[in-house]
Amino acid sequence: MINLALVIFLCTLLNQIVSWVGKSVLQEIAFTAYSWVFLSGTAAKQRKLRKQVLEDKAELGRTSSQDEFAKWAKLRRKLDKGLADLEKTNNTLSSSRSSFSKKFSTLLWLMTTGAQFLLSWWFRKQPIFWLPEGWVPYPVAWLLSFPSAPIGSVSSGAWGAICRRVLSTLQEIIQSVLAPSPAATGPVPTGPSSAKNDQPEAKIEALALEHEKLD
């Protein structure tokens, strides 16, 4: 019983981790590791071809097609061949990435959603654990034992739903704790109004200066 409850919890936890981190992020990490092990030679060839193509382009740009036509034509043929080889290598890596993405998505679905469905259906009649007698009303007891577990027990499907709810609530709590607090709003500046109030005084001072000049 305890092992089954733990297995269902771990499957639910794995599913939630995939949801939290993101499928695309996990796929990118997995493909990077896969490329490092199985596609290192092709990736090295791609880098070498890209470097050679850039060098050939630079040298071709420095060569005059009129004054050095033979050299220019040779460089042009070399550049065209390098571009063709680079495109072929890029297509190989792109095809490998597409194939890996499909296999990874299938494997991830089997390990998360598929495993949860299989466990809930295969152990649908087996109670995960029993509740104390009379601890919950009959409608709640029937709901916890849905679809085929004995009344008074918690079924595999109900246990999986409880685990998902607890993990989702835990995620919300962590996000609310780590979320930055809103910045406090400061007092509204009163600069323009004070400037307006100072204008009459300035006018009075100007008039006083004019009277002094006249005197």
UniProtKB/Swiss-Prot annotation:
Residues 1-4, 130-153 are lumenal. Residues 181-202 are annotated as: Disordered. Residues 25-108, 171-215 are cytoplasmic. InterPro entries: Get1 (IPR028945), Get1_fungi (IPR027538), Helix_hairpin_bin_sf (IPR029012). Keywords: Coiled coil, Endoplasmic reticulum, Membrane, Transmembrane, Transmembrane helix, Transport. One of its GO terms (cellular component) is GET complex. GO terms for molecular function: protein-membrane adaptor activity. Disulfide bonds: none annotated. The chain crosses the membrane at residues 5-24, 109-129, 154-170. Pfam families: CHD5. GO terms for biological process: tail-anchored membrane protein insertion into ER membrane. It is found in: Endoplasmic reticulum membrane. It is a multi-pass membrane protein. Residues 73-94 form a coiled coil. Belongs to the WRB/GET1 family. Interacts with GET3. PANTHER family: GUIDED ENTRY OF TAIL-ANCHORED PROTEINS FACTOR 1 (PTHR42650:SF1), TAIL-ANCHORED PROTEIN INSERTION RECEPTOR WRB (PTHR42650). Required for the post-translational delivery of tail-anchored (TA) proteins to the endoplasmic reticulum. Acts as a membrane receptor for soluble GET3, which recognizes and selectively binds the transmembrane domain of TA proteins in the cytosol. This is Protein GET1. It comes from Cryptococcus neoformans var. neoformans serotype D (strain B-3501A) (Filobasidiella neoformans).
